[in-house]
């Protein structure tokens, strides 16, 4: 199969939404029956985002094969059906690390290692490898044109375009077209300068996607086309919208997919966007509204919980409910008390690392249990629910996780030292293992017990969900907690690790060690989140069974 490439770059400012624009175009091309994939090239020196602070970088998105990747891969999976893998995201740090490892082995036979050709060749090899087997690959380069870090990546895609030829490669560049209220017009000069910067690297954009808070007038688009050396119909106006799921229709209405197919000589049927039309309709016509409290420690940057936020919205679509997310700092729960949780229709405690704010999360789980408020715990959210139950119901005074308190008499959560991965291999870890890439990662099989809430929601005895954690329920203390009434409703493939817990004495209290948010999509939703939001609506209306 011959693969065609669309290289996506950004200029003027960062955070323009390259990932959303690229994913939207990919969704249209997929709707035309083409096999599409996407890649994200990150210019930072970290080997992967796994050890980066969520408040700096946003969430770490985990792929099925266990790669810790950029949050843009979450957007990709929510827009297209192709599942991302470790081949769909790599960083400058990963490239340099691999090149240096080869140099140490002597693979370069004593050559002087340079950015060109060694680093650029490595980037090109990874792009070609990751795109193999698809009709079209959209390759997004992180950062902004002109950044010193992105130069090797820009050079690599320039070389690739030359090697592939015009009939197999094209460039899509996103820029900002600001509106000046004093002048009463949009300004194209930043876009012109951004393209000029791109041209200085040797790249001529074929499509310009212009971000603005309004539609860009026809005369301004003509001006951009003239000065930036692109066809007028290739200047795409991408105005601000109230939902990212409207972007595919916005791009298609301007014939962007037709431009791509014409350039690559592809004959494909018209795109069927009926699924996206349904998503937009559901989003615009809710029958009610619920407020869900997200109790976390990274709330100053909502992108730290990007997939959870989106999964809640998707669940809202499935229930025809508008979901308002109220971010609650877990430290506020500690310092101000559980009063900050009053008035919520449901409580969600997401994943996290470190002991800051943990007691606040434990209090949130206790509040939800005692007041019969719907509760969904994810990863650490399951662990704090277990700790709270052990302390206050099983009467295991001072119960805790060994991650936060090594002196506890009841370490109900402890480090996993050995487990079987998705491929059946046994993985081992110790307290002294590196932090990076040493967790239980990726999609794992889970057995659900019949007659439980989890089984009812999923409608299946076996499921696959993605993991990212080092700590698990301590099986030595598990019988004591179960005896006190907590139900273990999900177990790992080898039935040695606890994956899902429930409180049978509560109308809706479910917590999972895995991350269900990573597999939720706007078109399909996710059963766990759909059930949770439904319960929130019933709780609000006083219909939730006590």
Curated annotation (Swiss-Prot):
GO cellular component assignments: cytosol
Keyword Ligase part of the UniProt annotation: yes
Functional pathway: Pyrimidine metabolism; CTP biosynthesis via de novo pathway; CTP from UDP: step 2/2
Signal peptide (UniProt feature, chain positions): none
Active-site residues annotated for this sequence: 379, 515, 517
GO BP term, pick one: 'de novo' CTP biosynthetic process
Catalytic activity of the protein: UTP + L-glutamine + ATP + H2O = CTP + L-glutamate + ADP + phosphate + 2 H(+); L-glutamine + H2O = L-glutamate + NH4(+); UTP + NH4(+) + ATP = CTP + ADP + phosphate + 2 H(+)
Regulation: Allosterically activated by GTP, when glutamine is the substrate; GTP has no effect on the reaction when ammonia is the substrate. The allosteric effector GTP functions by stabilizing the protein conformation that binds the tetrahedral intermediate(s) formed during glutamine hydrolysis. Inhibited by the product CTP, via allosteric rather than competitive inhibition.
Binding site for ATP: 15-20, 72, 239-241
Residues that hold L-glutamine according to the record: 352, 380-383, 403, 470
Residue span, Glutamine amidotransferase type-1 domain: 291-542
One Pfam family linked to the record: GATase
EC code(s) of this entry: 6.3.4.2
Metal-binding keyword on record: yes
Region ranges (Amidoligase domain): 1-266
Name of the top EC class for this enzyme: ligase
UniProt binding sites for Mg(2+): 72, 140
MF terms in GO: ATP binding; CTP synthase activity; glutaminase activity; identical protein binding; metal ion binding
Residues that, per the record, bind CTP: 14, 147-149, 187-192, 223
Remarks, miscellaneous: CTPSs have evolved a hybrid strategy for distinguishing between UTP and CTP. The overlapping regions of the product feedback inhibitory and substrate sites recognize a common feature in both compounds, the triphosphate moiety. To differentiate isosteric substrate and product pyrimidine rings, an additional pocket far from the expected kinase/ligase catalytic site, specifically recognizes the cytosine and ribose portions of the product inhibitor.
Record note on quaternary structure: Homotetramer.
Family: Belongs to the CTP synthase family.
NCBIfam families in the record: PRK05380.1, PyrG
Primary role: Catalyzes the ATP-dependent amination of UTP to CTP with either L-glutamine or ammonia as the source of nitrogen. Regulates intracellular CTP levels through interactions with the four ribonucleotide triphosphates.
The protein, known as: CTP synthase
């Amino acid at each position: 199969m011959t693969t065609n490439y669309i290289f996506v770059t950004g200029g003027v400012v960062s955070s323009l939404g390259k990932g959303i624009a690229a994913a939207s175009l990919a969704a249209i091309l997929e709707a035309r029956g083409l096999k599409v994939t996407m890649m994200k090239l990150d210019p930072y020196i970290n080997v992967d985002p796994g050890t980066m602070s969520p408040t700096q970088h946003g969430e770490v998105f985990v792929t099925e094969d266990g790669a810790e990747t950029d949050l843009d891969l979450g957007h990709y999976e929510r827009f297209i059906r192709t599942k991302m893998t470790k081949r769909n995201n790599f960083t400058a740090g990963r490239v340099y690390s691999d090149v240096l490892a080869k140099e140490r082995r002597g693979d370069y036979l004593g050559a002087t290692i340079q950015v060109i050709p060694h680093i650029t060749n490595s980037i090109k090899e990874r792009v070609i490898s990751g795109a193999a087997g698809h009709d079209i690959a959209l390759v997004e380069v992180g950062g902004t044109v002109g950044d010193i870090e992105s130069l090797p990546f820009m050079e690599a895609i320039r070389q690739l375009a030359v090697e592939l030829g015009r009939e197999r490669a094209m460039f899509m560049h996103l820029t900002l077209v600001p509106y000046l209220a004093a002048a009463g017009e949009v300004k194209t000069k930043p876009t012109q300068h951004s393209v000029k910067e791109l041209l200085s690297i040797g790249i001529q954009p074929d499509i310009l996607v212009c971000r603005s808070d309004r539609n860009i007038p026809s005369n301004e688009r003509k001006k951009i086309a003239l000065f930036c050396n692109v066809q007028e119909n290739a200047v795409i106006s991408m105005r601000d919208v109230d939902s990212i799921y409207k972007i595919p229709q916005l791009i298609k209405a301007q014939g962007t997919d037709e431009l791509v197919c014409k350039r690559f000589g592809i004959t494909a049927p018209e795109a069927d966007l009926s699924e996206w039309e349904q998503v937009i309709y559901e989003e615009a016509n809710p029958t009610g509204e619920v407020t869900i409290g997200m109790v976390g420690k990274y709330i100053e940057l909502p992108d730290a919980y990007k997939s959870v936020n989106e999964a809640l919205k998707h669940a809202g679509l499935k229930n025809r409910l508008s979901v308002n997310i109220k971010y609650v700092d877990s430290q506020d729960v500690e310092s101000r008390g559980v009063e900050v949780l009053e008035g919520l229709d449901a409580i969600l405690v997401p994943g996290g690392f470190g002991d800051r704010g943990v007691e606040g999360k434990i209090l949130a789980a206790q509040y939800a249990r005692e007041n019969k408020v719907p509760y969904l715990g994810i990863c650490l959210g399951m662990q704090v629910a277990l700790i709270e139950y052990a302390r206050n119901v099983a009467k295991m005074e001072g119960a805790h996780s060994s991650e936060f308190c090594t002196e506890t008499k009841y370490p109900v959560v402890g480090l996993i030292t050995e487990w079987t991965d998705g491929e059946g291999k046994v993985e081992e870890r110790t307290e002294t293992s590196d932090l990076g890439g040493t967790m239980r990662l990726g999609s794992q099989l889970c057995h659900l017990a019949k007659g439980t809430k989890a089984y009812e929601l999923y409608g299946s005895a076996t499921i696959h969900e993605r993991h990212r954690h080092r700590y698990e329920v301590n099986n030595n203390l598990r019988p004591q907690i179960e005896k006190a009434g907590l139900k273990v409703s999900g177990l790992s493939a080898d039935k040695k690790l606890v994956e899902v817990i429930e409180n049978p004495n509560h109308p809706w209290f479910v917590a999972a060690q895995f991350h269900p948010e990573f597999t939720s999509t706007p078109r399909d939703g996710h059963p766990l989140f759909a059930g949770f939001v439904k319960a929130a609506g019933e709780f609000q209306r006083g219909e939730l069974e006590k």
